[in-house]
């Protein structure tokens, strides 16, 4: 009987990363097919953004566009090195990017803490470079924000949730938290945008630990 082992994914270095393209892969973004709002702005005064990676971005985007206070969502890539990457390039593991959902929200209606807590509860943030059967650095858990203050808020929530998970027998939390700029986020191809609205029976895995985060609205 033969056994086949998949090698553990390894993060690419900047020197090893693909060079990327000169132009965005989505040059003419269309309005959100569910919310009817733009996916690239201009944003209303007071609206904020957070970039969230919980594994495959199709189901994650759907989860967030259904939340009250979320004004727009889109899917793309961030956290890596390759400019204007294609989906195929990201899936190769040679860009350093993870699959990301950009969430534009009204902080008067929903807080950053609530968005982060919902994300943590929706996946298993202890799995490193995978979510279930989706294996690769592009499926890592990540929250990217625009300011250091926001990053500290997210890190505190992630750290507390990590201790909660350990008390239930899970391993170390591996969620990445960092500050990025909007220019560090690259929109994915049009067919990925609001994918589960266009394909209601499409792939939508669930990897929740079932452990509540404890952040109250």
Swiss-Prot record:
Please name the catalytic residues of this protein.
Answer: 56
Q: Which GO terms describe its molecular function?
A: L-methionine-(S)-S-oxide reductase activity; peptide-methionine (S)-S-oxide reductase activity
Q: Where is this region: Disordered?
A: 16-39
Of the GO CC terms on this record, one is: cytoplasm
Alphabetized UniProt keyword annotations: Oxidoreductase
- Chemical reaction(s) catalysed: L-methionyl-[protein] + [thioredoxin]-disulfide + H2O = L-methionyl-(S)-S-oxide-[protein] + [thioredoxin]-dithiol; [thioredoxin]-disulfide + L-methionine + H2O = L-methionine (S)-S-oxide + [thioredoxin]-dithiol
Provide the E.C. number(s) assigned to this enzyme.
1.8.4.11
Pfam families in the record, alphabetically?
A: PMSR (PF01625)
BP terms from Gene Ontology: cellular response to oxidative stress; protein modification process
Q: Which SUPFAM superfamilies match?
A: Peptide methionine sulfoxide reductase
Q: What does this protein do?
A: Has an important function as a repair enzyme for proteins that have been inactivated by oxidation. Catalyzes the reversible oxidation-reduction of methionine sulfoxide in proteins to methionine.
Q: HAMAP family from the xrefs? A: MsrA (MF_01401)
> Which family does the UniProt entry place this protein in?
Belongs to the MsrA Met sulfoxide reductase family.
Entry-linked PANTHER family? MITOCHONDRIAL PEPTIDE METHIONINE SULFOXIDE REDUCTASE
What NCBIfam families has UniProt attached to this entry? msrA
Give the protein's recorded name.
Answer: Peptide methionine sulfoxide reductase MsrA
Gene name of the encoded protein: msrA
């Amino acid at each position: 009987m033969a056994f086949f082992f998949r090698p553990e994914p390894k993060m690419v270095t900047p020197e090893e990363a693909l060079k990327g393209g000169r132009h965005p892969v989505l040059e003419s973004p269309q309005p959100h097919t569910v919310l009817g709002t733009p996916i690239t702005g201009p944003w209303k005064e007071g609206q904020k953004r957070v970039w969230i990676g919980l594994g495959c971005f199709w189901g994650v985007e759907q989860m967030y566009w259904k939340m009250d206070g979320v004004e727009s969502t889109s899917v793309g890539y961030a956290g890596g090195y390759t400019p204007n990457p294609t989906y195929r390039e990201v899936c190769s593991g040679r860009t350093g990017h993870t699959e990301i959902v950009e969430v534009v929200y009204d902080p008067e209606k929903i807080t950053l803490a609530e968005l982060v807590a919902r994300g943590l509860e929706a996946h298993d943030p202890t799995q490193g470079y995978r979510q279930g059967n989706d294996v690769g650095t592009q499926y890592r858990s990540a929250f990217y924000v625009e300011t250091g203050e926001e990053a500290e808020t997210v890190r505190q929530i992630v750290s507390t949730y990590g201790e909660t998970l350990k008390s239930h027998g899970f391993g170390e939390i591996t969620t990445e938290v960092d500050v990025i700029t909007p220019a560090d986020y690259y929109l994915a191809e049009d067919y990925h945008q609001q994918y589960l609205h266009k394909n209601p029976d499409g792939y939508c895995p669930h990897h929740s630990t079932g452990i509540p985060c404890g952040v109250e609205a």
